[in-house]
Amino acid sequence: FAIQPMSKGQFQIDVVSLFPSDTWNDGKSVFRKDIVQNLKEFSPSFIRFPGGCIVHGVNEETMYHWKKTLGPIENRPGQWSKWAPYYRTDGIGYHEFYELCEYVGADAMYVMPTGMICSGWVKQSPQWNFRHIDVDLDAYIQDALDAIEYAIGDTTTKWGAERAKNGHPAPFPLKYIEIGNEDFGPVYWERYEKIYQALSAKYPDLIYIANSVIRVVGRENDDKRKDIPNFVNPKNVKVFDEHYYNSIEWACEQHYRFDNYKRGVADLFIGELGINGKYPYNLLATGAIRMSIERNGDLNPLFAERPVMRHWDFLEHRIFLPMLINGVDSSVKTSFFYLAKMFRDNTFDVCLDAAIKDIEGLQNIFVTMGYDTASKQYILKLINLQDKKVTLQPEVSGFKRPVKAHKTSLVLVPGKENTP
């Protein structure tokens, strides 16, 4: 690629964006074929967008404003991001997000701003009631209504017509609206109630998701949902998003976390999970929590894999391994991809009792088992966080004689994070 000037002079170039000519959807999309193919192989049930801290930013200017991400990319202003050195170009805008959902067969989860900024950028009071900026909440509510109308509104509506103008007359697969990201406290719940009432009145069939405080409050195994009745009518909180960032040791201790969660209240959503520590133990430790989630299927749990992908050039200071690492001309599936896919491809809807026979010196071995009524298969999952091979004797209920089994193994080796 070259730009050949016709005469001497100074040139200023903006919005330089190069794509292969054969992108997904016969060259009509902004997504490379290899990246979309990897996502299709994973087969997500939903995609959460625009994600986390991009939603609330550090002030109103840096919040996610979806209307500014429509239209030709050269007209999109982009925005500074707290995740330096990233600067958002918004090349994947609100419209492209829904197109990606359609390409991979996923439902859409849009995370809307509530006018509350990142809690790390506001002053804290003794009551954990962060002093957030004053905003016109009605404007944020109207903006969210416009966003929903753009996604699923009839083409006779203002924003439904705009969607059609941008090449998509049919509605997009919007299913979830998350009200804020990591917003919490009395101010949040006051705003949540107003937003929920306004949105659900017009769009009652969408599923609305509330936020929780990011840290663990009280005892480590406390149910984060227990304080909801102190702030809002619990009937208006259908799904509750819990985020966790902690150590390997903490993750191992959470293997039974959700067993004691109260039933009959908000459904469980783990929108973000990040375990710090040495590879591969940090990655395997996420499995201990995942087992607790799938063992408690009556909580109707949702789980979002994150981070989904990163560019090769921005991996140096990463903490958490993404599922995909993308370069200029390739997309690599990492160990995280394969671990997550093993869980995704082996789900069950009936939980069964399973344990590891007590062996002296055996620690950090995790097990769960269930029955999948669709495939009529029993599924046994084992995770070994020790740095050596071990011989295990799982104890499972309901089997009177030996049975044939198919084994799938994922071996993670220290120092080889990209490919297992």
Regions found by a protein language model. Name each.
Residues F1, I13-S21, I47, I177, ...:
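Extracellular beta-strand elements of beta-rich domains used
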Residues F1-E41:
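Extended acidic/polar, glycine-enriched regions
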Residues S43, C101, A147, I177, ...:
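Conserved, mostly hydrophobic/aromatic
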Residues V55-I92, W121-D146, G153-E178:
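Aromatic- and acidic-residue-enriched carbohydrate-binding clefts of CAZyme catalytic domains
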Residues M116-S119, V265-K376:
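Aromatic/acidic polysaccharide-binding cleft in carbohydrate-active enzymes
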Residues A144-D146, Y150-A161, K165-L299:
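Active-site neighborhood of glycoside hydrolase catalytic domains
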Residues Q363-V403:
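Carbohydrate-binding surface patches
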Residues K400-P420:
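Acidic, Ser/Thr/Pro-rich beta/coil linker or hinge segments at domain junctions
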